[in-house]
């Protein structure tokens, strides 16, 4: 064993008191599996704007009791340094059903209690949006949700919210990371401290949930979403997650309890997600059991939430075949419905805002131009959408929708983060409207396309365990052409603009500088082809070893837009990234 690895192992045994993870390391040493040992020990799991996310297991690079305690100590210390009366304001802590989630949540609570924080602890499983809602409602200094959302079963995570109810943005991530490095020695391992500590509140959840449902009902009623209508049957699946009781409560709230048929094999929380390869409704196969249930009952609609119920997915059966709508399509449909209802109740159009990210469909931008409402674009991630929504809210603006293409939707601003339950109930109201008009979602989307333009999005990724290679491949595009640096063409199409949010370059601005926030910690480059006929963004993932690309193509017809998107997708592979040559896996 090399000296650096030996030092890390010694440090691990000095700090870790969990017999399971101590034994994992001991077994690797006994087997002389130094390659795996090095992989789990270094580099330390990074704390970013998404908090922590990694596979569960021993080592400083993994999610385990020690790294959760260390993260909590650093976060608590950072709050004490930066937020006046942070301990008195307190923190909210919630968790989902994943392996070790309850243990990690209890250890997080123990650390904050030891640091003197009032600690609001959800005793039961919650869907992720309840934590930022609680932070906002209770006025706490921060919140922590233990979840890995829709990642595979081997993963868990530690998601952090600031006192404004939004996910954290820079520079908080770096500040917290620095405090973690200075607070590595555990101050407690007592998982039961939250049971009887005087600063622990485990009874707040009942009142908080009543408040959540009350605000949800009020928002939908005020904006004319929730008129009573005839029954509409649909199939719902939580994909082995926590969503079912929350969706059921939402249906009861609006008098719809008899309309839903569930998927028995996927109803209950199961951290192993046994019926799906990936518990992500974006992935092929994730909704197959729901389709089977719908087919068996003669139902044309499937609605789903991801395991922590912050994302929402929809599929419709048309002409005997299932169509799973993309996140962009659902986002545009929701924006259209919410705006129409807002307009119908006579509210001022100039106050209506829809927010989306740089990698979302351009259709919503076209819709805003045609209809006269405001559209604002942010960087990728709800941390940016939530904070921008809050900024506009303070100006008295109405946030109709904020969305990102990865099935994340914030309807209104009850929660300043994506909420799959609120999105689902909103979409259900839309379906009931269309039922009265004898229209399908597919038909409505065709009407929208004729009015706002035919747009096709094709999003995918390359997977590699060699993260530096992914960054190097993107960096090579900055030196692709000897004259301008960036490529001048892709396939048969001319590249007319480039925006690089890693370097801060934007060819479309007068001074060549980007107006959106710049970050050197990850890659984010947008190429505009043929003056907006195709907009494509390439970015490295903050939570996964992926190089993601997002293509939005416009055309004179659906077929034309698909053709444009497909040409660009193929050219990315054949001209820029050469997957086989570079050892990149495709989904």
Curated annotation (Swiss-Prot):
It comes from the Eukaryota. One of its GO terms (biological process) is glucose metabolic process. Keywords: Carbohydrate metabolism, Cytoplasm, Glucose metabolism, Isomerase, Magnesium, Metal-binding, Nucleus, Phosphoprotein. PROSITE patterns: PGM_PMM. Converts ribose 1-phosphate to ribose 5-phosphate. Involved in ribose salvage via the pentose phosphate pathway. Its cofactor is Mg(2+). It holds the Pfam family PGM_PMM_II. The modification Phosphoserine is found at residue 149. Substrate binds at residues 49, 53, 149-150, 310-311, 380, 404-406, 418. This is Probable phosphoribomutase. Belongs to the phosphohexose mutase family. Coiled coil: none annotated. GO terms for cellular component: cytosol; nucleus. GO terms for molecular function: magnesium ion binding; phosphoglucomutase activity; phosphopentomutase activity.
